[in-house]
Regions:
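Internal alpha-helical scaffold of NAD(P)-dependent oxidoreductase catalytic cores
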Residues: 50, 120-129, 145-182, 195-232
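NAD(P)+-binding Rossmann beta1-loop-alpha1 motif at the extreme N-terminus of oxidoreductases
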Residues: 3, 9-72, 144, 206-207
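Small-residue helix-packing motif on alpha-helices
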Residues: 49, 60, 92, 211-218, ...
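Rossmann-like NAD(P)(H) cofactor-binding subdomain of soluble oxidoreductases
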Residues: 34, 66-67, 71-148
C-alpha cells in the first residue's frame, strides 16, 4: 500500500503525516486538545482532518471555524486513511454500531479510549492495524505526556506515524500494552492531581488573607518552575526536595505536616484507584 510520487519516482512512507486524511470520531475535550495541538504545531494540515459527531454538530462547526478542519458527515469516514477513536470507552460499542460500515481493514485506527484494548478495536475493524495512545489534555499546548502501544497488526511504519503525530505535542514513550493502565493513572489522570494540589495551595493562601488572583499566579509559577527545574537538572525529585529542605526551616515544617497528614499515601491511593478504574473500563 506504499504510495509513490509520480513526478520523482520516490517511494513514500505508507503513512505520511502531511498527506493522510485523518478522521476523528468524537469531539470531546481530548479530541479538541488533539486538534488544537496538531493545527498549532503544523503537524497535519487542517484541511486533511475531519471531525465526525452527529450528536454534537455545534461543536464540530465551532472546531471547523476555529481550526479550519472539516465538520464531517459520517460518509467522510470512507475517504479517511486514519480513523481516530476519541470517544468515551463506554460509548465505543455505540460508535461501532453507528459507523462500523465505514471500517475497513486497509485503514489505520488510533484510539485514546482508556481501558479499551487494541484487540477490542481490531475485532471491531476487521483486524486492521491499531495504535493505542494515552495522552493528556496538555496536547493542546504541546506539553502532553503520551504513551502508546501497537496492536498485533501494526508495525514500524505505524509506530513512525505515532511518533510523527505526537512528538510535536510533548513527550512520547512506546510501551507494552500491559503498562497502559499504569500510564492512564500516572499521566492521563495526573493533570487532575496537579490541579487539586493547585486548588489546595490557592485556597490555603486565600484563607490566610491573600488576594486570590495573586495566590493563583504565585502557585502556578511555583509549580511550573519546580517542574522545569526537575526537567532540566537531571536530578531526582527526592534529591531536589532534600536540597531545599533546610533543617528546622519552613520547608521542613511544611513537608513534615503534609506527610503526617498522609500526603504520599493519598497520592498513591489516587493512582491505584485510577489504575483499577482503567482496568474496569476495559472489561465493560
Amino acid at each position: 500500500m506504499d504510495k509513490f510520487a509520480a513526478e520523482t519516482g520516490e517511494c513514500k512512507m505508507k503513512w505520511d503525516v502531511k498527506t493522510i486524511r485523518l478522521a476523528f470520531i468524537g469531539s470531546g475535550f481530548m479530541a479538541q486538545a488533539m486538534l488544537r495541538g496538531l493545527v498549532r504545531s503544523g503537524t497535519v494540515p487542517p484541511e486533511h482532518m475531519g471531525v465526525v459527531n452527529p450528536v454534537d454538530p455545534e461543536t464540530c462547526a465551532r472546531l471547523s471555524r476555529e481550526y479550519g478542519v472539516l465538520a464531517a458527515e459520517p460518509e467522510w469516514l470512507r475517504q479517511a486513511d486514519v480513523i481516530f477513536f476519541a470517544v468515551k470507552p463506554q460509548t465505543f460499542p455505540e460508535a461501532c454500531q453507528m459507523y462500523g460500515k465505514y471500517f475497513t481493514a486497509d485503514k489505520l485506527y488510533l484510539t485514546i479510549m482508556a481501558g479499551v484494548s487494541c484487540a477490542a478495536v481490531e475485532a471491531a475493524t476487521g483486524n486492521a492495524a491499531v495504535v493505542r495512545f494515552m495522552p493528556n489534555l496538555a496536547l493542546s499546548v504541546q506539553k502532553s505526556a503520551t504513551a502508546y502501544c501497537l496492536g498485533k497488526h501494526a508495525g514500524e511504519e505505524e509506530a513512525a506515524l505515532a511518533q510523527a503525530l505526537f512528538s510535536p505535542l510533548g513527550v512520547v514513550a512506546r510501551l507494552p500494552e500491559a503498562q497502559l493502565s499504569a500510564v492512564t493513572a500516572l499521566s492521563g489522570s495526573g493533570p487532575a492531581y496537579f490541579y487539586l494540589l493547585c486548588e489546595a495551595m490557592i485556597e490555603s493562601a486565600a484563607a490566610d488573607g491573600m488576594n486570590r488572583e495573586t495566590a493563583r499566579a504565585l502557585t502556578v509559577q511555583t509549580l511550573e518552575g519546580a517542574a522545569a527545574l526537575i526537567a532540566f537538572s537531571g536530578e531526582s525529585p527526592t534529591e531536589m526536595r532534600r536540597r531545599i529542605t533546610s533543617k528546622k526551616g519552613t520547608t521542613e515544617a511544611g513537608v513534615a505536616a503534609l506527610e503526617e497528614a498522609g500526603f504520599s499515601r493519598a497520592v498513591q491511593a489516587g493512582y491505584l484507584a485510577a489504575r483499577r478504574r482503567s482496568d474496569e473500563l476495559g472489561k465493560q
